[in-house]
Amino acid sequence: MCHRCGLSDEDLNRRWSRPDQTLHPVIYNAKGLIEYCCRVLHRIPYFYCDLHGHSRRKNVFFYGCSQAGSWNAADRTVPEDPTEFLLLPHILQQTAPAFSLNHCNFRVERGRESTARVALWRQLGITRSYTLESSYCGCDQGPYQGYHLGTYQLHEMGRNLCEALRTLYEDGWKLKLVLACSSPQTFANEQPNRVVGGIAGLGGVRTYEEEAVLTNPSDDSDYEEEYHAMNECH
């Protein structure tokens, strides 16, 4: 059985849209706490991240949410600032050896509406809502190319993520300006399906010259990847 299933034999990361208090108590209460912050305290979380393992793609990467990459035509009519959700993966590309911006995907598919990242993005307005995937298949880039991800690399990735969040929170306005100026055509929505850019000009930050894919029909979707041989959900 897939270890993401609860006692009701359901994939718990497909129950975030309308969790049942009896069948999915962990999801129900976790979402309730976040919803309380948003609707009662009027404090929308700055960042949400679901941590997953990935059985097919390599490296560490994000799944995120973009209006421009949504299956819903109504979403695509809503203006958005892509730097709001793209800056964090750009920072990690510069600072985290195991992270791959090129593997990130910000497409919102219909079949993902009940996942944590999409439900919290859509229902509660959390712009930086992600799934962080760490591969079971190791890395094919950078200093860890050809090696599996061990506890050292996972701890390092955790530190890199926390440091990137601090950088984003403290210097996000500077990074937005640099990123927009380095690739203005991207943020003029001329090519809404692809994000090409760089974060350069800040001390200690390397130039980035790769691409983050918003929509790529050839990419495997995250539900197709979940342990689909040995760990298939029944």
Question: What is each PLM-predicted segment?
Answer:
Residues 1-234:
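Structured catalytic-domain cores with a bias toward divalent-metal coordination
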